[in-house]
Amino acid sequence: MKFSVLTLFPQLILPYFEDSILKRALEKNLFELEVLNLRDFSANKYQKADHTLIGGGAGQILDPEMIENALHSVKNPKHTIFLSAVGKPFKQIDAMRLAQKKHVVLVCGRYEGFDERSIELGADEVFCIGDFILTGGELGALCLIDSIARHIQGVLGNAQSLENESFENNYLETPNFANAVFKSKEINKIPAPLEYSKGNHAKIKQLKLDLSKLRTKFYRLDLFKQHKS
């Protein structure tokens, strides 16, 4: 699989892949990463990347011809995602689906965002990562890549790490407890559920499901209400 990131600030993207799990995955060629500087595709000799708004208003928007040129430079087939606050919220099910793609292109917004024609002509999907505003789409792109890459075979050392995660079946992941002895009196005041240590896997599974439901009801009532029981 390949990820291509189109951004005005490549230096914000590259350091994220210099350590930990995704660094090892790149070294093993489990996925490819390409980072393109949008300014390189500007028709302006000074690499100007933005324009004022028609009809007035504060801020600038990204040059649509620059976006078009950059997207044309990326080989097909590709699935193009624009990162913008106007997009639909990115969810776990999207990460699982997009992990099946061969090439995902992520276009990072900046300033007041995109000319609407860029979205209409270039985007297969538009995503945001929450109901809040960032200075650019780079963090969103990194979030998507991280979330998608985890579902590529071999990226996680233990495939079981993907099982029973938060948002599977719209429940949050069950509370977890370390299998260790601690010196901290405060930690020891809160014992792990006794059932976890008894070895009855059927009962442990049911308890984890019950705790998962309780946690979802407490933290994410919106998800909990999606279940009839």
From Swiss-Prot:
Task: Kindly state one GO CC term assigned in the UniProt record.
Answer: cytosol
Q: Where does S-adenosyl-L-methionine bind?
A: 109, 129-134
Q: What class of enzyme is it?
A: transferase
Give the location in the cell.
Cytoplasm
User: Mind listing the UniProt keywords for this protein, alphabetically?
Assistant: Cytoplasm, Methyltransferase, S-adenosyl-L-methionine, Transferase, tRNA processing
Which GO terms fall under biological process for this protein? tRNA N1-guanine methylation
What's its catalytic activity?
guanosine(37) in tRNA + S-adenosyl-L-methionine = N(1)-methylguanosine(37) in tRNA + S-adenosyl-L-homocysteine + H(+)
A GO molecular function annotation here is: tRNA (guanine(37)-N1)-methyltransferase activity
**What is the E.C. number?**
2.1.1.228
- Which proteins does it associate with, and in what oligomeric form? Homodimer.
Q: What protein family does this chain belong to? A: Belongs to the RNA methyltransferase TrmD family.
Q: What protein name does the entry list?
A: tRNA (guanine-N(1)-)-methyltransferase
The gene name on file is: trmD
